[in-house]
Amino acid sequence: MSLASLSVSPGKGRRVVVGMSGGVDSSVTAWLLKQQGYEVIGLFMKNWEDDDDSEYCSTRQDLLDAASVADLVGVDFEYVNFAAEYKDRVFAEFLREYSAGRTPNPDVLCNAEIKFKAFLDHAMTLGAEHIATGHYARVRAIAGAHGREYQLLKALDGSKDQSYFLHRLNQAQLSRTLFPLGEIHKTEVRRIAHDIGLHNAAKKDSTGICFIGERPFREFLNRYLPTEPGDILTPQGQRVGRHHGLSFYTLGQRKGLGVGGVKGSQRDDGTADAWYVARKDLQHNILYVVQGHDHPWLLSNRLQALDASWVAGRAPELRGYGAKTRYRQADAACVLEQASQGAFELSFSQPQWAVTPGQSAVLYDGDVCLGGGIIA
């Protein structure tokens, strides 16, 4: 894709507010939309009140990066603080889920409640017709039974597709959303950033919890949840260690268990299989671990999901689909056996590994993301 080929004008002066994080993806998003004729306003969202100096410095640098890009691209730039909304709508639920022994995905809730709700509402007060972000996904308008309908699709760059995190978006949100990066690959995004002289062209992608950053997770969680150490047991009841609190562990976890030196089953060559978290017993505060990646306790043929959210506003028909139970997982063949506005059940053709309560099960029909729910 050449830069010249991007100089078209489908925007025709329409106003769009771009969520600018200071990273390369949102920066190129703003530039692309400006090239397409949109009236672009860049908006930096502060969604976490900094509680240490290093995080303050990181957030400040991101803000400076975003403002610098807006100046280079030639768009207006604003700053808004959504910390109160994030705390009430996302972080409180995040802590409730961990307290209940589940492993939530705050990025899913953050997208639904902050980036595409609080941000969208604010953009509308600025007279915008659309919002845009640097997510790798696509939106497609089709003729539905009751008029125009919007579909959420995977990005063309499958290695960067983020539709999994966006599956809770509804028709109203999708109708106002643009994902310019959904049609191009990440390598092209960095090339564009380099060609137009963006100083953050080589900036590392963020991988931390949504708006909390890349800090030691156990240390962070320990500030908000009480620790209650307990026993680590095998399925046979053998005590192999002590845990720091069930909230700090997730199904399938291998590192940080402190049981590496414990003898268990061994292979023919005398080496031992790794230990994995397999279950949590909240009532008795017991963490169960098993040896071997493919231990039966780690495999599931079925799942139930609650708090279902369907992109089309209605549950899909009962038939075969693909599903993800974690990000970056290949779609697993499954059958949707029961579905309603509030819950659904899936059966899988092949056993699924470490299906984790609190994570999202997301349903796909080819490239079309149908929605999903929270694994029970």
UniProtKB/Swiss-Prot annotation:
Main location: cytoplasm
Keyword line: ATP-binding, Cytoplasm, Disulfide bond, Nucleotide-binding, RNA-binding, Transferase, tRNA processing, tRNA-binding
Gene Ontology molecular-function annotations: ATP binding; tRNA binding; tRNA-uridine 2-sulfurtransferase activity
A Pfam family the protein falls into: tRNA_Me_trans_M
CDD domains attached to this UniProt entry: MnmA_TRMU-like
Active site: 110 (nucleophile), 210 (cysteine persulfide intermediate)
Keyword 4Fe-4S applies: no
Annotated localization: Cytoplasm
Cellular component GO terms held in the UniProt record: cytoplasm
Residues annotated as site: Interaction with tRNA: 135, 359
Catalytic activity from the UniProt record: S-sulfanyl-L-cysteinyl-[protein] + uridine(34) in tRNA + AH2 + ATP = 2-thiouridine(34) in tRNA + L-cysteinyl-[protein] + A + AMP + diphosphate + H(+)
Disulfide bonds: 110-210
Protein residues bound to ATP: 19-26, 45, 134
Top EC class, one word: transferase
EC number: 2.8.1.13
Region ranges (Interaction with tRNA): 160-162, 326-327
Cited SUPFAM superfamilies: Adenine nucleotide alpha hydrolases-like
GO biological process, one term: tRNA wobble position uridine thiolation
UniProt region (Interaction with target base in tRNA), positions on chain: 105-107
Family membership noted in the UniProt record: Belongs to the MnmA/TRMU family.
Classification via NCBIfam families: PRK00143.1, trmU
Function: Catalyzes the 2-thiolation of uridine at the wobble position (U34) of tRNA, leading to the formation of s(2)U34.
The protein, known as: tRNA-specific 2-thiouridylase MnmA
Organism: Bordetella petrii (strain ATCC BAA-461 / DSM 12804 / CCUG 43448)
Higher taxonomy: Bacteria, Pseudomonadati, Pseudomonadota, Betaproteobacteria, Burkholderiales
